[in-house]
Amino acid sequence: MQHTRHNNARKLFSEIDLNPQNYLIIHYSCESFYDIKDGHTPRITSIAVYAYATAQTDSFSIHKVAEKSHIQISDIELHYDELEKKMLDEFFAYAKEHSNFFWIHWNMRDINYGFKAIEHRYSVLGGIPYNIPDEKKIDLARQLINCYGVGYAGHPRMEKLLEQNDIKAKDYLNGSQEAAAFANKEYVKLHM
């Protein structure tokens, strides 16, 4: 069983390497889902999509939408739903335009954190999300486990992988740091 998962993951990594023009890498930042007491879904602050073949990044963020709307960063909270809706309008238009791509992500697989969470949030704000089909989503975290087994890196795995490979991640924030940046209204930090 593990041997089959390992081989399938290796084939997938080879396919990505041979055809990078078919792959996008996505990450997003949101309000902490652990600190919400009233039951609302976490607000999305930014989404970054990196084209693997060209190394170009398209980003969708609250502070950029605020700037285009002539709203000061200090006033974002007063207009958050409106700005978030505009940001997600842009993101879902982009997703629809890139429907033929595969989306590589890290643990974005449920309603708490993932594509479903972004779709739900957009629906709450009155939008109609474009649904990226599950067969177009590649969970890199899961594929690394498939390839190397559960013990390939300690927890938190992303940070441990950075350490193991001596990678200095510029502007990297872990989940709790992202949540703190949101709470402190440091929206630009969440965009990086």
What are these regions (language model features)?
Residues 43-45, 50-71, 101-192:
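Metal-dependent phosphoesterase core characteristic of DEDDh/y 3'-5' exonuclease domains
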Residues 2-116:
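Conserved non-catalytic scaffold segment of RNase H-like nuclease domains
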